Amino acid sequence: MGFVGDFCDDVARSIGFLSRIPMPARHFEGYDGRLSRAVRAFPFAGLAIALPSAAVAMALMALQVSSLFAAFVVVAIQALVTGALHEDGLGDTADGFGGGRDREAALAIMKDSRIGTYAAVALILSFGLRVSAFASILPLFSPLGAAMAILGAACLSRAAMVWHWSSLPPARSSGVAASAGEPEPAATRFALAFGLLVAMLLFYLAQVPALGVIAALVAFLATVKGFARLAMRKIGGQTGDTIGATQQLTEIAVLGALALTV
């Protein structure tokens, strides 16, 4: 199978892994569940996953609906499409990092499915910050531009997941991230290049000012690097939860940067 066929398989597997969107079974024939190569398609999968919310946002803004209502709808659709996968990772990470006395305690807490105080606060802040950021920026763009801004942030945040995953060792020998394998260096480079280039193109087409683009890039870089350092200090590496938390934190940072500068 050539590059196009392999990439289509990787896109389908990435979308299937990151969301509740059903994918054709033919893309999973002989698939062992590892994502070492498939992570190169994470940014593209982010575009597909965010497309429903972007389309609804475009329609609502064209109808001149309240930007706050539109922002709530956008975030709600994103959570439904992903099954709140990334929010779950953020909540578990917040509980583990906040309540764990040491590495072992933090990892044990992160495996607990119950929601603690730190998780509740983190999720409230995540939804609140994203809704407020969307409410701030959506009316500043044309309806199509608003959709492109949503897609750009989604693309960047999925590239951030690959960067975090590839830059840290597994914090535990079992779990989703460990069983899915370590991202291949070539796949990581492709994901970062694709994610950055496509996000910048979408921001350009949305007519985001140069200051906004620079601020979004700085927010992207600072969040991924800063959170990776925190994860390394707290648990000695990455897990599926910290990968999901990276998506949430990066999207919040990028949207916040746009809200402050557009």
UniProtKB/Swiss-Prot annotation:
Cellular component GO terms held in the UniProt record: plasma membrane
Location of this chain's protein in the cell: Cell inner membrane
Chemical reaction(s) catalysed: alpha-ribazole + adenosylcob(III)inamide-GDP = adenosylcob(III)alamin + GMP + H(+); alpha-ribazole 5'-phosphate + adenosylcob(III)inamide-GDP = adenosylcob(III)alamin 5'-phosphate + GMP + H(+)
UniProt feature coiled coil, ranges: none
Keyword Ion transport included in the entry's annotation: no
GO molecular function terms listed in the Swiss-Prot or TrEMBL record: adenosylcobinamide-GDP ribazoletransferase activity; cobalamin 5'-phosphate synthase activity
Keywords: Cell inner membrane, Cell membrane, Cobalamin biosynthesis, Magnesium, Membrane, Transferase, Transmembrane, Transmembrane helix
Membrane-spanning ranges: 41-63, 68-85, 115-134, 141-163, 201-221
Lipid bilayer topology: Multi-pass membrane protein
EC number(s) stated in the UniProt entry for this protein: 2.7.8.26
Biological-process GO terms, alphabetical: cobalamin biosynthetic process
Keyword Chaperone in record: no
Pathway terms, separated by semicolons: Cofactor biosynthesis; adenosylcobalamin biosynthesis; adenosylcobalamin from cob(II)yrinate a,c-diamide: step 7/7
Listed cofactors: Mg(2+)
Physiological role: Joins adenosylcobinamide-GDP and alpha-ribazole to generate adenosylcobalamin (Ado-cobalamin). Also synthesizes adenosylcobalamin 5'-phosphate from adenosylcobinamide-GDP and alpha-ribazole 5'-phosphate.
Family listed: Belongs to the CobS family.
Assembly and interaction partners: Associated with a large complex of proteins.
Protein name: Adenosylcobinamide-GDP ribazoletransferase
Gene: cobV
